[in-house]
Every structure is written in structure tokens, then in C-alpha cells.
Amino acid sequence: MNILLITNDWKPKTGGISTYLRSLVNNLDHKFIIYGPSWIEGDDAYPAEDTFIINPRKVFEDIQKIVNDNLIDIILHGSSNPNFLFVNKLNTLNVPNSPKNVKIPQYMICHGAEFNVLNYIPVVRNLLSRNLDNLNTIFTVSEFSRKKLSDITDTEIINIGAGIEIPNYENNYENNVPLIIGVVSRLVSRKKISWLIDVAHDLKEEGLPIELKILGFGKQENYLKKLSSVSAVNVTFIKDETEKDVDDFYRSINLFAMPSKSKYFGVEFEGLGLVYLEAASYGLPVIVGASGGAIETIIPGKTGFVAGDKNILKESILYFLNNPEKIQEFGLNGKKFVEEFYSWEKLIINLESNIESIK
């Protein structure tokens, strides 16, 4: 099957959606053509000439040519924004060489806040709904996102979840003192990394052995570094450069925590949180935020905890400081949970069966 993936999230861009789509392409045994903004990279990439959003007519002409030149069977939209703008126009395209002028099927993967924010903009809401209604099927990464979308569109919505590449790594759980807490994240306010610094500071002031490692970059980087500079706890900042850097990071920590919080009264939320699953795949206990689909990435009390505020975050970290043997128990439970419910093999089977059944 020849699949045209239209996306605003592709290498060299980083982030959860970009990581998800690259892994999807690597694991799906079909030919992919990638169409996106002028800066996308790759052997099968077709960068637009700076017209991806500002010139929809040129976008349509580009896609029409790609579809015909590459005998595209289906169009897969990598996310809802800005792709919802193209759906209705692309519904005029036929499957190449189709004797019956069959319309080319369109599918979309929706993640979380990228569609929910649009739904709260009055001018955009109706346009979003009308375009989503013209898709064959919408796939979501979490049950939370599926339920949110069901209020926006009548199109069939299927939660396919996420997939994680399980690392070839066995955690020996031998060095849990000091407790090294890690977070992999964009450094933005919604991730509440400042909470981690504040709580770690308080625990260090109480004489407990604790350190904090932060991997990522973003708007709050300078603010968080200033906060760390007056903290009692040792905070290390790392910028992710390669997959090996991320791999080494997960191997160097004992506990993963990212207490994300929804913003604007729930308009912007965590669609799922791939980093929670990545951390669990390394055999780490995980503390998630009470935001969107994040709570679907753990089994509370068995693989991690949900921290909706700083007090609960502190209690959750204290649990592992006071019960170090639970680090291994929770970590092993978490790795088993990810292997059972978040393998790429299961996701691909689910995705392909639903695409094939509709074609």
C-alpha cells in the first residue's frame, strides 16, 4: 500500500507527535511519502515551498501531483492542525487509475490539545467539525482524546493508542541512593517542572538523599535554571542531541516524574505522554500529572502515581524514598504493562485492520 503522510511534525522537528509519526512509519510495512513544510527532511520527504499553510491552493496542487505520481492508495493526516483545513478539498481526489473514480480514503491521527484548542475558537469550531466529518476514520492516541473528539465530529473514532520501542536493557536496581529523579520534556509551564525543583528542594532541606535531572529545552529553560541555582538540591540540565543521549539519560535515573497540568480550564491537556511510556519501558516507576490521557500510561499504586498538585507529588516521591524496594517492584510492573498494552506490533495490527476494513 502506498500511503501519503501529510504532517507538520517531522524531522528535524522534535516532540511527542514527531516521535510518534516517525516510529509509526518505521514500523508500518508500507511505502510512505511524507508531505509537509519546507524544512522537513528525509529520502521520501516532499517539502512544500513555504506554502504549507498560507497557500492551500498550492498545497492541493502539490498533493494532487504526489498522489498521481506515486499511485497513492490512502492519505494519512499526521495531526488535526493544520491538516483539517485540507480535508474537504482533498475529498475531490480519486484513487489513481481507478476505473470507477473512487475517492481516495482519508484518515487522521489526533493526539490531544492540537484539536481541542481549535474547538474553543468560535470562528474555527464549525470549520473543524465539517472537515473532520469528511474523513473515513479518525485514530486517537488515548481514550481521553477519543471521548473529547466524539463531541466534535460524527466520523468513526478509534483509539489505537501508542507504541513504544522496548529497549534492550535490564535495570539492576542496585543504586537507589541518592534517589535520582528525571524528566524528559519541553521546558514549558504546563509540564510543571518547577514543581519538581521545589519539591526536591524541600526534601533535600529535610536531609533526604535526592537529585534531579532535566532533559529538554524550551521557553522556561532560563527560568528553571535560575530557580535551580538557589535550590538546595543538585539539578542537572541536559539537552537531548541523539537517541543515545536519551537512552543514557533513562539508564541514569531511578524515578521518572512529569506532573503535567492542563491549562486554560482543560482546553490544553496531555494527549497521552509518550515519555511516561518510554520511562516505564526502562523499568522505572513513573509519576504522571492529572492531565488528559496521561493517567492511561500507568496503573496507579502499581506502576506509578498521579500527582495533581505539589503536595501529592511530594508524597509520591517520599513513598519511594521511604520504600526503596518499591522502585524495583513498580519498575518491573511498569515495563510489563508497556510490553503488554503499548507494543508497536499490536498498534500496527489494530491500525491496518481498520484501514483495510474501510477500503
PLM regions and their residue ranges:
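Donor nucleotide-sugar binding/catalytic pocket of nucleotide-sugar-dependent glycosyltransferases
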Residues: 108, 133-169
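A short, well-ordered alpha-helix in the C-terminal region of glycosyltransferases
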Residues: 319, 326-341, 347, 353, ...
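Nucleotide-activated donor-binding/catalytic signature segment of Leloir-type glycosyltransferases, i.e.
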Residues: 224-247, 255
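Short His-centered aromatic/hydrophobic patch
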Residues: 77-83, 110
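Conserved donor-binding/catalytic core segment of Leloir-type glycosyltransferases
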Residues: 6, 174-191, 197-201, 213
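Conserved acidic donor-binding segment of nucleotide-sugar-dependent glycosyltransferases
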Residues: 299-311, 319-325
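Short hydrophobic beta-strand element within catalytic cores of glycosyltransferases
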Residues: 276, 280-281, 285-288, 298
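Acidic donor-binding loop of glycosyltransferase active sites
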Residues: 251-269, 284
